[in-house]
Design a protein with these regions (language model features):
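Conserved GHKL (Bergerat-fold) ATPase module
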Residues: 1-298
Length: 298
C-alpha cells in the first residue's frame, strides 16, 4: 500500500556529540532540603562517594576564589574540574603500587591514623571475577569489642559504590578486616536484602575467608613478630570465634592461636608445644586465667 506522512521537515541544529539531561529539583519541604543538590561541594562529595572509580571523567564547572595578579584582592573564577579518580587503586598492578600509596589509601578511606599492619590485594578470575583490597589494622578500633562496631567490606560493582558495610563478605571471626570488593558480575541494583541470597556473593565471601586465613598462616610462619602484634590486638576474636561456633571452627582456627609458655617465656603455638614434649609426657599442662600475672601466682 501507499505510505504517507504529515511530518514537516525542519532545520536541526546539531551541536556537540552527547546527550543533555536536565534535572528539576522539587521545592524544599520541612523534612527535605533539595537545594543542597545545587551546592557544588555537595555534588563533588556525592561523585567521590558513588562514582569516583567509573571509567569516564565526570567534569563540573566549579567556582573557586583566586588571588588576582599583582593584587591582594581575590576574585571568583570558574574552573573545569574532573571530580573522579577514574582508575581505582585496586585495579592497578600491585607491583606498581608503593607501600605509601596503600597506607595513604587505607587511612583516608577508613579514617585510621595508623598504617595498616597487613595489606591483602588480590584479583580473582573465574565463574565469579572480582578485585579485593583488604587491610588488617595495626590497632583495634576503640569500639571494636562493643556493640557499636560494624563489620563488613565496602562493595563496588564495576567501580560504582554500592554499599559501605556488606557484612556478608567477611565472617564473624575475621570481623577486624577492613577493605573493599569490586566485581563486574554483581548487579548495580543489589540491595542488602538480596545480599543474603546472592549466590555469587557467597562464592566471593568464601574465597575471601580462605584468602585471609592463608595470609594469617603465612604471617605466623614467616613473620612472627608481626603476627604477635596482630594477635595482641585480635587474638581474642579468634578464640571467641571457636567458642561462639560451639567448636565448629576449631579445626580451622586452632593453628592460628598462640599460648604463653612459662618454660620458653614467649608465645608459641599448640603444635610447637607438642613438638617439644618429652616422649614420656602424655598430657598437655596448662593454666587459665585473666592475666599472666594472676596465672603465675597460682
Amino acid at each position: 500500500g501507499d505510505w504517507s506522512s504529515d511530518v514537516c521537515s525542519s532545520d536541526l541544529n546539531v551541536g556537540d556529540h552527547g546527550t543533555t539531561i536536565k534535572l528539576y529539583l522539587k521545592d524544599n519541604t520541612d523534612d527535605e532540603n533539595y537545594d543542597e543538590y545545587l551546592d557544588q561541594y555537595h555534588l563533588q562529595s556525592l561523585v567521590k562517594k558513588y562514582s569516583d572509580y567509573v571509567h569516564y571523567p565526570i567534569v563540573m564547572d566549579m567556582t573557586v576564589s583566586k588571588k588576582k595578579e599583582d593584587s591582594d584582592e581575590y576574585e571568583d573564577v570558574v574552573e573545569n574540574k574532573t571530580l573522579n579518580s577514574m582508575v581505582p587503586l585496586w585495579k592497578r598492578n600491585k607491583r606498581e603500587i608503593t607501600d605509601e600509596e596503600y597506607n595513604d589509601f587505607y587511612k583516608d578511606k577508613f579514617n585510621d591514623f595508623n598504617d595498616p599492619l597487613k595489606v591483602i590485594h588480590s584479583r580473582v578470575e573465574g565463574t565469579v571475577s572480582y578485585d579485593a583490597l583488604l587491610f588488617i589494622p595495626s590497632k583495634a578500633p576503640m569500639n571494636y569489642y562493643s556493640n557499636d562496631y560494624e563489620k563488613g567490606l565496602q562493595l563496588y560493582s564495576k567501580g560504582v559504590f554500592i554499599m559501605d558495610k556488606a557484612s556478608e563478605l567477611v565472617p564473624e571471626h575475621f570481623r577486624f578486616v577492613k577493605g573493599l570488593v569490586d566485581s563486574e558480575d554483581l548487579s548495580l541494583n543489589i540491595s542488602r536484602e538480596m545480599l543474603q541470597h546472592d549466590r555469587q556473593l557467597k562464592v566471593i565471601a568464601d574465597k575471601i575467608e580462605k584468602k585471609i586465613q592463608s595470609e594469617l598462616e603465612n604471617m605466623l610462619k614467616n613473620d612472627r613478630d608481626k603476627y604477635l602484634e596482630f594477635f595482641d590486638n585480635f587474638g581474642l576474636q579468634l578464640k571467641f570465634g571457636i567458642y561462639n561456633s560451639y567448636g565448629m571452627l576449631k579445626e580451622k582456627l586452632q593453628d592460628l592461636l598462640l599460648y604463653y609458655s612459662s618454660k620458653e617465656e614467649k608465645y608459641i603455638t599448640l603444635a610447637e608445644y607438642v613438638e617439644k614434649m618429652p616422649e614420656n609426657q602424655k598430657e598437655i599442662y596448662f593454666a587459665s586465667g585473666e592475666t599472666l600475672d594472676k596465672i603465675a601466682k597460682i
